[in-house]
Structure formats: C-alpha cells, structure tokens
Amino acid sequence: MRLRNGTFLTLLLFCLCAFLSLSWYAALSGQKGDVVDIYQREFLALRDRLHAAEQESLKRSKELNLVLEEIKRAVSERQALRDGEGNRTWGRLTEDPRLKPWNVSHRHVLHLPTVFHHLPHLLAKESSLQPAVRVGQGRTGVSVVMGIPSVRREVHSYLTDTLHSLISELSPQEKEDSVIVVLIAETDPQYTSAVTENIKALFPTEIHSGLLEVISPSPHFYPDFSRLRESFGDPKERVRWRTKQNLDYCFLMMYAQSKGIYYVQLEDDIVAKPNYLSTMKNFALQQPSEDWMILEFSQLGFIGKMFKSLDLSLIVEFILMFYRDKPIDWLLDHILWVKVCNPEKDAKHCDRQKANLRIRFKPSLFQHVGTHSSLAGKIQKLKDKDFGKHALRKEHVNPPAEVSTSLKTYQHFTLEKAYLREDFFWAFTPAAGDFIRFRFFQPLRLERFFFRSGNIEHPEDKLFNTSVEVLPFDNPQSEKEALQEGRSATLRYPRSPDGYLQIGSFYKGVAEGEVDPAFGPLEALRLSIQTDSPVWVILSEIFLKKAD
C-alpha cells in the first residue's frame, strides 16, 4: 500500500513535470517565432533603407559630377580668358571681381596680367570688349581665318574690290574651309551700318553660308588718343593712326583666334592670285618644323602674314604692351628678336635666327592696289615687285592682223604688244563710240574668240557694255544665211551701219564664244564700246583661233 502510494505520487510528479515542460517548450517556441519575425522585419527595413541610401548616393554622385563638369568648364574659360582665348566670354569679364586687383581686399595676393592691365579704360563699360556689330554665322573649326581691318578713307574705298578678289579666287571646297572676317574699325554707328549693309547687299550668299563675317568694335574699346606722346619724329596724328592700327589688329586677332588653325592678316586694298588659299595651306603644312612663327606671302607691310592661331595670344599680349610706342611691323620684329636673338652675338647671327621663325614665300600671292592711305592726306604707290603678272599663254599665236584703236594708250602698254601676247593693253577712260579693231591681212575663218579685260593688279579696269563684232568678207550669200534663221525676217545678229555683225558681248570683263561658220571668211573683228566708262581699261588677253 505504501508502495502503491509512492508509485502514484511519482507518476503524478512525472506527469506534472512533463506537462510543465511541454507548456514551457510551447511558450518558448512561440516566443522564438515572434523574435524571428521581428528580426526578419528589421532586416527588410534595413535593406529598404540601404537601397534608398544607395539611390540617394547615386543621385548625389550625379549632381557632384555635374558640379565638377561646371567647375572644369569655368576653369577652362578662365584659363582661356587669361591666355587671350575664349572670345565668347568677354562679355562677362568685368563681372568677375578677381579680374580687378584693386577691388581685392588682400593686397599681398599675386595677380596675373590681363588685357585690363594694358587697357584699364575697358573696365568702365561692360560692353567694351563686345563687338558693336556682328554679322555672319559665327563659323568655327576651319583651316584658315583671314582678317581684314578696314577704316574710313577720304577719297576711295577698296574694300568691296578686295572682297571680290579674295572670294572669286576660292574654290567651293575652300569656301567651306575658311572664314573672312572684316573689321570695320570705326565707331561712328552710321558709317559702320552703311558699310555693313553694303557688304550684306553685295555678298548675301557668302554671309549666309558663313564664309564672310563683319564686325566692328565697341566705341568704348579705344582709349583717349589725345594723351599720346609723339615719338620717332612722327606728328601726333600719325602717332594716333599707328596706335589705333595696333589696337585694330589686336581686336581682330582676339576675335578670330578661336575660329581656325591658321590666321592670315590682310588689308582692305589688295588683290589675290588664283589658288592663293591652297598655296598658303600647303606651304604651311610642308614646313619641316613647327618652330616657325610668321609665314609671309607678300613683302609689303602687314599683308599676307600667316600665324598659327595658338600663337595669337602671345602676339596680342606683346602688341598691347607696346601699342603706344611703335608701329606693328617693328613690334613683330621685336617679338622675333626677343625669342631667338642673343645680345652677345652680332646682327648677322640674329638675322639668321629670325629667318627660322619668319619664312618668306615667293612669288607673292597678294598685291597692294590702293593709292589713298587710311592716314588722311597720305598717297602711297606701294607695289610688290615679287607679285608678277598673269602668265600669258605663249603657246597660241594670233593670226596676222593690223591692230588699231581710238583709245589713248597709257605709256608703253600698247595694243600691238597685247595682240602679240607680250604684255597687256592699257588705255585711258573709254567713251561711247570708241573701238578696238583687228583687220586681218588675209580674210580668214575664225572658230572662236576670247577676250579678258582687267588684270589681277587692276581688276576694276574692265570693259563694260562692249560688243564683239565681225565684218564678213565680200560674200553676200554667207552673210544672208547668217542674218536670217529659216524664213524668219528677224535678225539673228544685230548689224551696225558700217556692216559689222554683233556676235557677242562682255560680261564681268570677259567675252568669249564661237564664230558661226556661215559667216565664211572674215575681214575684221572689232570691239565696240557702247557707253562711257568710269574707269580706265586693260585688255589683258586676246585669243583668236583660226578655223581648221
């Protein structure tokens, strides 16, 4: 009995312990599941926060990259601005207080020189370095940029003739790979507007295509010239003229330097040879070294001087340092002297060293044609002796003829020499009724004719409103066939009272064409001037081809 009671108690205790163990395990298992759920939710929340942080980091990284690019761009612009480049940023120059050392509170800070150190008056106006006039497409990335400064002349302007010469000698490909920048270096708005409108009217295609640009400086670009000192025996007016000229060159170079690889300085009173642009490019590319600084394509003044655009900032800075002191050609020579001449060597050694930087091309590609200088009252008859003339086609011989003219011949430039292709014919101003006649020694048949008036040195001395006429030999039947077309009574060739038949006329200084075989043998050929001409006349080429 006592054993049974003990066994029962033991069994009861065991069951109670088992029940408590199961309850505790169940409770523990439930608590453990809750903890896992909590941890899982926290991990999910943490993952979401990490993903959001990653997205925010990417966003901030993009923003930082944009800011970095903006900083790089700003630094690049400032660096280009300091070197004289960055033409597009000039309008913001005066807004940067760092470019005004007198506004900086720290007096011990070092400041690099800028254009404002040499021309402090520019700080008075924000627009002082912005062109007052700018016409064109702003073309960049070309091989050659040609700069032409032009000022008001009291007697005659040669600018449009110069542009005609330069543009007419460019091939279509060259027109796509070059820019001509005309600087109207005057501050009178009426004058600059008139010249600009005239250029736009005469060269609309070139303006629209981007080949031609017209600019003029701000009236605030120039300093007060009344304070200049006379030097080298020049009167004050000449000192003012040469000083302003230096600044004109600087303005033009600063504007053009970011447009192309090479920059060519020209003047507004020149003519150019055919293929001048490709000749200059090839000469530059064929140089055995990149050490050259100036390639010269004319021996006169500042005409036909080619520079590498990368060198323009140095040249501009040097000119600005001494623009009041000496003319441009002296300053250019001084740059070369500073770069390569040894003061301990003699002048011959210096000249040899400078010859490596200043290389001359012959024959000259440009000729000076103006006689009235931009300096008031100055007459200059400068001619480049290396320029030469058009090559005459010696291989052709005109048929024997007696030549005569009613025009008054200038000096030794006779019609006989022109007909023999030894020189050109030059005569004083023609009037209506004047003529140039070629009477053949024996009647002959002509196949074609070609006449060119004007030449590269005097392109304006052309024949205008002039007809080409022939006089058939005594052959009534051939004349009748030539005068009529079918049964029509309308004249095919206008006939003059003295029997000459008009078969052609001059257009832009040139007359060419074929001769109708129906005329048969011809007795004479005549150039007949119909109206008075405002200029002298040059007949540079005469080509009469006999029929086989």
Curated annotation (Swiss-Prot):
Task: Kindly list the places in or outside the cell where this protein is found, as annotated in its UniProt entry.
Answer: Golgi apparatus membrane
Named in its record, the pathway it takes part in is: Protein modification; protein glycosylation
Reported modifications of this chain? N-glycosylated.
Q: EC number(s) on record? A: 2.4.1.145
Mind telling me which InterPro entries this protein's record contains? Glyco_transf_54 (IPR006759), MGAT4_A/B/C_C (IPR056576)
Cytoplasmic face: residue ranges?
1-7
Which residues does the annotation flag as glycosylated?
87, 103
Query: What does the record give as the reaction this protein catalyses?
Result: N(4)-{beta-D-GlcNAc-(1->2)-alpha-D-Man-(1->3)-[beta-D-GlcNAc-(1->2)-alpha-D-Man-(1->6)]-beta-D-Man-(1->4)-beta-D-GlcNAc-(1->4)-beta-D-GlcNAc}-L-asparaginyl-[protein] + UDP-N-acetyl-alpha-D-glucosamine = N(4)-{beta-D-GlcNAc-(1->2)-[beta-D-GlcNAc-(1->4)]-alpha-D-Man-(1->3)-[beta-D-GlcNAc-(1->2)-alpha-D-Man-(1->6)]-beta-D-Man-(1->4)-beta-D-GlcNAc-(1->4)-beta-D-GlcNAc}-L-asparaginyl-[protein] + UDP + H(+); an N(4)-{beta-D-GlcNAc-(1->2)-alpha-D-Man-(1->3)-[alpha-D-Man-(1->6)]-beta-D-Man-(1->4)-beta-D-GlcNAc-(1->4)-beta-D-GlcNAc}-L-asparaginyl-[protein] + UDP-N-acetyl-alpha-D-glucosamine = an N(4)-{beta-D-GlcNAc-(1->2)-[beta-D-GlcNAc-(1->4)]-alpha-D-Man-(1->3)-[alpha-D-Man-(1->6)]-beta-D-Man-(1->4)-beta-D-GlcNAc-(1->4)-beta-D-GlcNAc}-L-asparaginyl-[protein] + UDP + H(+); an N(4)-{beta-D-GlcNAc-(1->2)-alpha-D-Man-(1->3)-[beta-D-GlcNAc-(1->2)-[beta-D-GlcNAc-(1->6)]-alpha-D-Man-(1->6)]-beta-D-Man-(1->4)-beta-D-GlcNAc-(1->4)-beta-D-GlcNAc}-L-asparaginyl-[protein] + UDP-N-acetyl-alpha-D-glucosamine = an N(4)-{beta-D-GlcNAc-(1->2)-[beta-D-GlcNAc-(1->4)]-alpha-D-Man-(1->3)-[beta-D-GlcNAc-(1->2)-[beta-D-GlcNAc-(1->6)]-alpha-D-Man-(1->6)]-beta-D-Man-(1->4)-beta-D-GlcNAc-(1->4)-beta-D-GlcNAc}-L-asparaginyl-[protein] + UDP + H(+); an N(4)-{beta-D-GlcNAc-(1->2)-alpha-D-Man-(1->3)-[beta-D-GlcNAc-(1->2)-alpha-D-Man-(1->6)]-beta-D-Man-(1->4)-beta-D-GlcNAc-(1->4)-[alpha-L-Fuc-(1->6)]-beta-D-GlcNAc}-L-asparaginyl-[protein] + UDP-N-acetyl-alpha-D-glucosamine = N(4)-{beta-D-GlcNAc-(1->2)-[beta-D-GlcNAc-(1->4)]-alpha-D-Man-(1->3)-[beta-D-GlcNAc-(1->2)-alpha-D-Man-(1->6)]-beta-D-Man-(1->4)-beta-D-GlcNAc-(1->4)-[alpha-L-Fuc-(1->6)]-beta-D-GlcNAc}-asparaginyl-[protein] + UDP + H(+)
- Provide GO CC annotations from the record: Golgi membrane
Any idea what this protein is called? Alpha-1,3-mannosyl-glycoprotein 4-beta-N-acetylglucosaminyltransferase B
- Species of origin reads Mus musculus (Mouse)
Upper lineage is: Eukaryota, Metazoa, Chordata, Craniata, Vertebrata
Gene expressing this chain: Mgat4b
